[in-house]
UniProtKB/Swiss-Prot annotation:
Residues 432-453 have a biased composition (Acidic residues). This is PX domain-containing protein LEC1. The gene is LEC1. Residues 229-238 have a biased composition (Low complexity). Signal peptide: none annotated.
Length: 1073
């Protein structure tokens, strides 16, 4: 009871009481869903009875237990509201099926109860967040966000006026303007790429050069330097030139001035390595000659970064303090991949890129400046790709090279038509001289050798440089950096051996040709970044034009819920982009730039772009567009979809469907692979300890047979008990299982003692990550590592077995069939009259034009004299096809008999209106919590309730302050790092450009920065702040988050009155519609 002497809740206390009540209610509802029969108490549209029972399914409209549509169970008011208001009303779902209770009861409810009965592992069992746990956390954030903004307290407007918590990132967004926005120059990019470290989990890794080396020995002589300046003599041609792809000798003869060396063997020391890089070509060759690609890797550990900010007066190659320089072959990369699979059998590591034989040629034109210095600009030309023949190349009148960099540099010059023609004639002359040159030989694994020839200079002093293995360089660099992103893999012994074993080469002693190769490859990296900056410049121009329009759009959207519908009418009335209003035209231009940038990033700009492009290109060639178009033109899409669904999901004679068989087969194959890894680990463990067989048997029995044991067995202990004890003792789960098994006399104590000793060694090794190789004294640590990995494999094997059983049982297939039908039914009704055959032809034309353009870029089919600009060409390509795409959207909307387009607008407007209730809603749309705690029918200690609310409030305020410090530190460090890293600069630029058009501020929608921070705190989703350098702040923050605040009276208020009050409030909101 509350008396007159009891002070009322102030606006801040009322707001946080509302938050805590909502959070407690949501946690309660999600926790209740862990019950196998939870949906029987959920309410509409589920059944309170056994859904598999033969009796007729109850009609919820007349059920006093469940209520009908628009009514919620007091046990699940929040989740019921989300289901009825946001999920059931989603436009792409068939209305008929959604209102059909049989779908929810006989399909969804039956599957839910079956799934919960199987007993899949939890996140704690895996020592990592399971997919279900991650989805649950994100779902909790979204729902809590909705209701915190959608349910208003009586004094909440006063609270929002008082709460001025703003994060630095939000302030930075407000300061974003054209004056603050700066594009880096070519010189800055080159400096950032070559001099500044980019650490990923403590490693800065870059492959800076690729060079060839003969595996056979050749004679070394003092005359190598002289022979390098003369024309090489080669043996007679051994076999005919077959194709551009298989034989590219003429290209290498013309352009390979970067690394024209053949070396016999890999020396142990860096001095001998680089001193033996011959500048000449052997006078004789044979078919048995073999060459390898050697990748020069530049590596740095983060511990050595302290002295790396000194004066940068030296050249790029002299700036090497703290770096390791090692060489590796593709075989070394294969061994690394194999070692990682052996060291982490339960981890899915990135796939090693396939070999490719592509050669990148680039043109650099040197111009003498007035001060006598020289400057070169890069032109990337890839000349050996796909199916281009030497013969067709020699007959082509347009064979030339592609210019890929922009004209940012004032001193940069472009080859004239005459110079280009001179280059072309010399290239064709080299083709005719091919009879005197031997073809390339490749390893049996497919690795190609590259010959090295003298540098060619045209009349204008333009140099053509061939960069062997450039595509492999970027792909393998991406592979290494992806490996380093995994914290455990980055500190593994396999990675450390790969990076640090062998001699540390002295970069000062490198051959000048290798030095040129390093510079040229850096210029290609700069060129890719420059093209991205060109996209950013275009996006910035469009964003500035669109900025004012978006402000008006945002204001109109908040004031008039029909404003979006009026914009949608333009799509219905017009067939071309040029006929749209200025706002939509600007928006389309902005979208085109992002699409163009995405295309460049996917196919040309990233390290792994080439592999993705070859896959897309191959798929495009195999796609039967004409046949598909004819089918879409003359055949009913509904019948096709129905036939496909019946084909995959039909169960002839009561057997398994094709879909069930497919997934069961895949899971069976996975289980076979899993069993091989398990047996290998069991063998290793058995070799390391005589009692290890008892350990593996105990763990396996606990994972696979614990659920089948007698519940009254005194020796039985559950996974929940193990997890609780593991968390309280801060020890790994498998160790707790073995300790409890030993306590129950299931295994000998000495076996557990040996594992505990191994665990202690493992912890010490984990803390000391500087040891490169594991010595014999550290074998006990490896013993525990294998046991821990074996536990994870057992858990995953158990889950895969359950997943296979789930696919074999009919419940999942029946639900999937109903869901697919529910989704495709409204879509095919639209596409039936949307001229899909025309849309498919237009898509084929777009893809063909795109493939042709990218082919020309890669193959170097576009001349340098044409002032070709890849950035502008991609944008023009998108512009060329924009009307075809817009016409398709127009046709779909015009024939939208299901109202999907307008349904999306209504659905989005409903969400926006709901989010604004707490900040902008009227008195009738609010809950008065002061009246709520004054009710006579509750047993609440209001003074204690206020104390608990203030304790929660103090915890949140303290957490906000530390969170803000951590975030400000992160932003400050991020800004500092972004200014040092080229990729960081580009990412920051995109963020600033985006904020001009679509500000990240959510205050207008009822969401403040403080509320969003509290949301992270409520759900424990603060991974964003992990791994910062400020350890003390992190410790304070985590300690505060782990501080347990007594909320007994708050939860009592929730259970006694708030759940019912929330139910009534939400039902009243629906009744108003």
């Amino acid at each position: 009871m509350i008396t007159q002497d009891t002070p009322a809740l102030n606006p801040t206390e009322e707001h946080y009481l509302k938050r805590e009540l909502l959070r407690c209610q949501l946690d309660y509802e999600i926790g209740k869903l862990n019950d196998q029969f939870a949906l029987r108490k959920f309410g509409y549209p589920f059944s309170p009875n056994d859904p598999t029972a033969p009796q007729p399914i109850s009609n919820n409209d007349s059920s006093p237990v469940l209520g009908g549509k628009g009514h919620f169970s007091v046990n699940y008011p929040m989740l019921s509201y989300v289901l009825q208001e946001f999920i059931s009303t989603f436009p792409l779902l068939s209305t008929n099926l959604l209102v059909d209770e049989k779908f929810w009861q006989s399909k969804v409810q039956v599957f839910f109860e079956h799934f919960m009965s199987l007993g899949f592992s939890e996140s704690y069992d895996r020592e990592e967040a399971s997919k279900r746990k991650k989805v649950s956390k994100k779902l909790s954030k979204v729902i809590l966000l909705l209701f915190n903004s959608g349910v208003g307290s009586f004094q909440e407007q006063a609270y929002y006026n008082e709460d001025k918590f703003v994060l630095q990132s939000g302030q930075a967004r407000k300061r974003s303007n054209i004056e603050k926005f700066a594009m880096p120059t070519r010189e800055n990019l080159e400096n950032l790429l070559t001099n500044e470290s980019v650490f990923i989990n403590g490693w800065d890794v870059n492959i800076i050069s690729v060079f060839n080396k003969n595996s056979r020995k050749c004679t070394e002589s003092v005359d190598n330097d002289k022979s390098s300046k003369s024309t090489p003599t080669s043996s007679p041609k051994s076999h005919a030139i077959k194709s551009f792809a298989s034989t590219s000798k003429w290209m290498k003869n013309a352009f390979n001035n970067t690394i024209n060396s053949t070396i016999n063997s890999m020396p142990e020391s860096s001095a001998s390595l680089f001193s033996k890089l011959s500048l000449g070509v052997p006078s004789t060759k044979s078919k048995q000659s073999r060459k390898h690609h050697y990748f020069l890797i530049k590596i740095k550990k983060q511990d050595d970064d302290d002295q790396d900010n000194s004066n940068e007066e030296n050249s790029n190659l002299d700036h090497h303090a703290g770096y390791f320089y090692v060489t590796r072959t593709y075989s070394d990369f294969k061994k690394l991949s194999h070692d990682l699979k052996s060291e982490f059998p339960g981890k899915k590591c990135p796939r090693l890129p396939h070999r490719n034989k592509k050669v990148t040629s680039m043109i650099t034109k040197t111009e003498v400046l007035h001060n006598g210095q020289t400057k070169s600009a890069a032109r990337e030309k890839i000349v050996n790709t796909f199916d281009t023949d030497l013969q067709s190349a020699s007959e082509s009148d347009n064979s030339s090279f592609l210019q890929t960099t922009n004209e940012l540099s004032a001193t940069e010059t472009v080859l004239t038509e005459k110079e280009t023609e001179t280059l072309r004639k010399n290239i064709l002359n080299e083709i005719k001289e091919e009879d005197n040159i031997d073809e390339d030989e490749y390893e049996e694994e497919g690795e190609g050798e590259e010959s090295d020839f003298d540098e060619y200079k045209d009349a204008s002093d333009s140099k053509i440089n061939t960069l062997v293995g450039e595509k492999m360089r970027t792909s393998l660099r991406q592979y290494l950096r992806t490996l380093c992103k995994d914290a455990e893999v980055s500190q593994s012994s396999s990675i450390r051996r790969f990076f640090l074993s062998g001699p540390n080469l002295d970069i000062k002693d490198i051959n000048p040709k290798i030095a040129d190769d390093i510079r040229n490859r850096a210029l290609i990296d700069v060129s890719n970044l420059e093209n991205q900056i060109r996209f950013q410049q275009m996006a910035l121009e469009k964003s500035l034009k669109l900025q004012d329009s978006m402000k008006d759009f945002k204001t109109s959207l908040l004031k008039d819920e029909k404003y979006l519908m009026s914009l949608l009418v333009e799509i219905k009335d017009n067939t071309k982009v040029e006929d749209l209003s200025p706002l939509l035209q600007d928006f389309v231009e902005w979208c085109k730039i992002y699409i163009s940038s995405m295309i460049y990033q996917m196919f040309l700009g990233n390290d792994n772009s080439y592999e993705l492009y070859t896959q897309i290109r191959r798929l495009h060639k195999l796609m039967p567009y004409t046949v598909m178009g004819q089918i879409m033109k003359f055949t009913n899409p509904i019948a096709i979809m129905r036939g496909m669904i019946e084909l995959f999901m039909a169960q002839p004679f009561g057997g398994h469907s094709l879909l069930q068989t497919m997934f069961s087969t895949i899971l069976t194959d996975d289980l076979k692979t899993q069993k091989v890894a398990i047996k290998e680990l069991e063998r290793k463990i058995a070799e390391m300890d005589p009692g290890a067989s008892v350990v593996t048997k105990c763990l396996k029995d606990f994972v696979f047979n614990n659920d089948t044991k007698d519940e009254h067995d005194t020796k039985l202990f559950t996974m929940d008990a193990v997890n609780a004890e593991s968390e309280s003792m801060n020890m790994p789960v498998p160790l707790i299982v073995l300790m409890k098994s030993a306590a129950a006399n299931l295994i000998p104590d000495e076996v557990v003692a040996g594992l505990i000793e191994s665990y202690s060694s493992w912890k010490l090794q984990k803390e000391d990550t500087d040891a490169l190789n594991v010595t014999s004294e550290d074998q006990s640590g490896i013993y525990f590592t294998h046991v821990k990995d074996l536990w994870q494999l057992y858990i995953k094997e158990h889950d895969k077995q359950l997943m296979r059983q789930l696919w074999q049982d009919p419940e999942l297939t029946q639900m999937l069939k109903a869901i697919v039908t529910m989704i495709y039914e409204p879509m095919v009704k639209i596409f039936k009259v949307a001229r899909m055959d025309v849309a498919l032809k237009n898509f084929e034309k777009f893809m063909s034009d795109l493939i042709r353009l990218v082919d020309d870029v890669i193959n170097g089919q576009l001349g340098v004299s044409t002032q070709f600009d890849v950035v502008e060409e991609i944008h023009n390509l998108v512009t060329k096809h924009q009307d075809a795409f817009f016409e398709f959207i127009h046709d779909v909307y015009l024939n939208d008999s299901e109202g999907i387009f307008e349904g999306f607008i209504t659905w989005i407007t409903t969400i926006v209106k709901f989010l604004q209730k707490s900040k902008f809603g009227g008195p009738s749309e609010r809950i008065d919590f002061n009246k709520l705690i004054c009710r006579d029918d509750i047993d609440i200690d209001v003074k204690l309730l206020k104390v608990q609310v203030n304790n929660v409030l103090n915890k949140k305020i303290g957490a906000r302050k530390i969170y803000k410090k951590l975030l400000d530190l992160k932003v400050k460090q991020g800004t500092k790092q972004n200014n040092k890293h080229a990729a960081g600069i580009l990412q920051k630029n995109w963020s600033d450009i985006n904020s001009l058009v679509m500000p990240s501020s959510s205050g207008s929608f009822g969401l403040g920065d403080g509320d969003l921070v509290d949301l992270d705190l409520d759900t424990g989703d603060y991974d964003f702040l992990h791994k910062e350098n400020e350890v003390e702040l992190e410790k304070q923050y985590k300690d505060l988050l782990n501080l347990v605040v007594d909320e007994s009276e708050i939860d009592k208020l929730r259970s006694q009155v708030f759940a019912q009050e929330l139910k009534n409030y939400l039902e009243a909101q629906i009744a108003k519609k």
